[in-house]
């Protein structure tokens, strides 16, 4: 290095370590419409001031590192750095704070959920100055939203494709999830669809195993779809799981589904990865396929209250990356989910514009502009007695998915499907007549069961089944 170069590099540079808050804690900062905003729940190590912890989060997830570097002088840190602009204590929790961080839009690649998450939730979650860190919410500015395709089709286009309006869609996950041959699997699909369901589904871990290779399954399922459509006069579908070990194999499976003429496929978007998921979503839009998203692995990330990432963030990521459906809990079933919290991220999936509402866990107003909405899927431990509550909580623009609640019917799969369809239509009719499903729901189901033996049998089997556990992830 020449003396001249050394002199230029050294101008204004002072080596050493300085507090993050001197650069990255800026309570006077006024956020811009183009900023990506993040709300982090942070638990600093003993002795670490919350301002220093919040600034460290902003620094390590944007331009900062642990020491001063001379190359800071070669760019404009004020333009590119993340800023912790507000900190508030969490009520009822000792040494927990919500840190609000603003990121300039230029830090992120357009149309890339992968890059967005690599930056914001990358290395910072292992930072030693923090005992725990959780990303509670993100505000994605319209200028960044518009760089994404989002869902392949969206709610209205899906309804038009299926020619089904004014009620929740009904589905069923085929069980046992592993071990069936392709022919028996297709038989189970056919029975459910002819009984009145709109969809059946591969479980998340059904890929291409020795007992049932993917192509065999796709062929038998397609036969079941077309046979049930011919019998019922309704459009039917099965979420054939295209998730695979490579993106190339995933797209090959999607191409097979397209050639068979089926309406929908499925992807495990967390285990499959955001890059693969976005590629698949683009393929689905180009080729007229609906895309169902399973959230397998989400609880590893979102279950703990003080560390990880809330599902509302993963839900927003799925809308950006692309999916027409995504699993969203049930509130009343066997899986985790508080009602107000669930309603918050369900609205974030479906609506064009969502106001800030901390009572529902919504930290920021979100404008999705032209991005299509996503149907929330209620699935996991639900049965006919849950139908009134599910109809009230999720409304018409949803998929209510009964696996054991269909296949566990004492008379078989088709009667199980009939029971769910009758219960759903009874609840929709009662709601449309002005009845209060929260108060009269059980009576609505009992009345419908008087003229439906299939529903009456289902009511008897599941009359005592409840999943009454305390929710871990509360507001």
UniProtKB/Swiss-Prot annotation:
Binding residues annotated for substrate, in chain numbering: 123, 173, 177, 295, 327, 379
Residues bearing PTM N6,N6,N6-trimethyllysine: 14
Site feature: Transition state stabilizer: 334
PANTHER family for the chain: RIBULOSE BISPHOSPHATE CARBOXYLASE, RIBULOSE BISPHOSPHATE CARBOXYLASE LARGE CHAIN
GO molecular function annotations of the record: magnesium ion binding; monooxygenase activity; ribulose-bisphosphate carboxylase activity
Biological classification of the source: Eukaryota, Viridiplantae, Streptophyta, Embryophyta, Marchantiophyta
Residues bearing the modification N6-carboxylysine: 201
Cofactor-binding details, from the entry: Binds 1 Mg(2+) ion per subunit.
Catalytic site: 175 (proton acceptor), 294 (proton acceptor)
HAMAP family: RuBisCO_L_type1
GO biological process: carbon fixation; photorespiration
Catalysed reactions, as listed in the record: 2 (2R)-3-phosphoglycerate + 2 H(+) = D-ribulose 1,5-bisphosphate + CO2 + H2O; D-ribulose 1,5-bisphosphate + O2 = 2-phosphoglycolate + (2R)-3-phosphoglycerate + 2 H(+)
EC class name: lyase
The entry's keywords: Acetylation, Calvin cycle, Carbon dioxide fixation, Lyase, Magnesium, Metal-binding, Methylation, Monooxygenase, Oxidoreductase, Photorespiration, Plastid
Pfam families: RuBisCO_large (PF00016), RuBisCO_large_N (PF02788)
CDD domains: RuBisCO_large_I (cd08212)
Oligomeric and partner information: Heterohexadecamer of 8 large chains and 8 small chains.
Protein name, UniProt field: Ribulose bisphosphate carboxylase large chain
Binding residues for Mg(2+): 201, 203-204
Cofactor(s) of this protein: Mg(2+)
Family: Belongs to the RuBisCO large chain family. Type I subfamily.
Function: RuBisCO catalyzes two reactions: the carboxylation of D-ribulose 1,5-bisphosphate, the primary event in carbon dioxide fixation, as well as the oxidative fragmentation of the pentose substrate in the photorespiration process. Both reactions occur simultaneously and in competition at the same active site.
Residues with N-acetylproline modification: 3
């Amino acid at each position: 290095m020449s003396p001249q170069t050394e002199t230029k590099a050294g101008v204004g540079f002072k080596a050493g370590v300085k507090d993050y808050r001197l650069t990255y804690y800026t309570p006077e900062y006024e956020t811009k419409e183009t900023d990506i905003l993040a709300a982090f729940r942070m638990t600093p190590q003993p002795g670490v001031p919350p301002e220093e912890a919040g600034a460290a989060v902003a620094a390590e997830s944007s331009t900062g590192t642990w020491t001063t570097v001379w190359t800071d002088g070669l760019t404009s840190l004020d333009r590119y750095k993340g800023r912790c602009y507000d900190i508030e204590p969490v009520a009822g929790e000792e040494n927990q704070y919500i840190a609000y961080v603003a990121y300039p839009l230029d830090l992120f690649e357009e149309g890339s959920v992968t890059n967005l998450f690599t930056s914001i939730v990358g290395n910072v979650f292992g930072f030693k100055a923090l005992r725990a860190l959780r990303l509670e919410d993100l505000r994605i500015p319209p200028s960044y939203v518009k760089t994404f395709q989002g869902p392949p089709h969206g709610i209205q286009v899906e309804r038009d494709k299926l020619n089904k309006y004014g009620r929740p869609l009904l589905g069923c996950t085929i069980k046992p999830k592993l071990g069936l041959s392709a022919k028996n699997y297709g038989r189970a699909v056919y029975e459910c669809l002819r009984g009145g369901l709109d969809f059946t589904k591969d479980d998340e871990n059904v890929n291409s195993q020795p007992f049932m290779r993917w192509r065999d399954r796709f062929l038998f399922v397609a036969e079941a779809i077309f046979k049930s459509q011919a019998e019922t006069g309704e459009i039917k579908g099965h979420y054939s799981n295209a998730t695979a070990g490579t993106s190339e194999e995933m797209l090959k499976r999607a191409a097979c589904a397209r050639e068979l003429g089926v309406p929908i496929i499925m992807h495990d978007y967390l285990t499959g990865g955001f890059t693969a998921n976005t590629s698949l979503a683009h393929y689905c839009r180009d080729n007229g396929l609906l895309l169902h998203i399973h959230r397998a692995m989400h609880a590893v990330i979102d279950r703990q209250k003080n560390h990880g990432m809330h599902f509302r963030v993963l839900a927003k990521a799925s809308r950006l990356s692309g999916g027409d459906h995504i699993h969203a809990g049930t509130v009343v079933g066997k899986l985790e989910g508080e009602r107000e919290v669930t309603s918050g991220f369900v609205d974030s999936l479906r609506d064009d514009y969502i106001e800030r509402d901390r009572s529902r866990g919504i930290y920021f107003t979100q404008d999705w502009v032209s991005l299509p909405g996503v149907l929330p899927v209620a699935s996991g431990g639900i049965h006919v007695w849950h139908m009134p509550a599910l109809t009230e909580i999720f409304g018409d623009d949803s998929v209510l998915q009964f696996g054991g609640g269909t296949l566990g019917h004492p008379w078989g799969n088709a009667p199980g499907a009939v029971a769910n369809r009758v219960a759903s239509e009874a609840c929709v009719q009662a709601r449309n007549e002005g009845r209060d499903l929260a108060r009269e729901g059980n009576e609505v189901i009992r009345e419908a069961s008087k003229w439906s033996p299939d529903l009456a049998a289902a009511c008897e089997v599941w009359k005592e089944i409840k999943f009454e556990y305390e929710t871990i992830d509360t507001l």
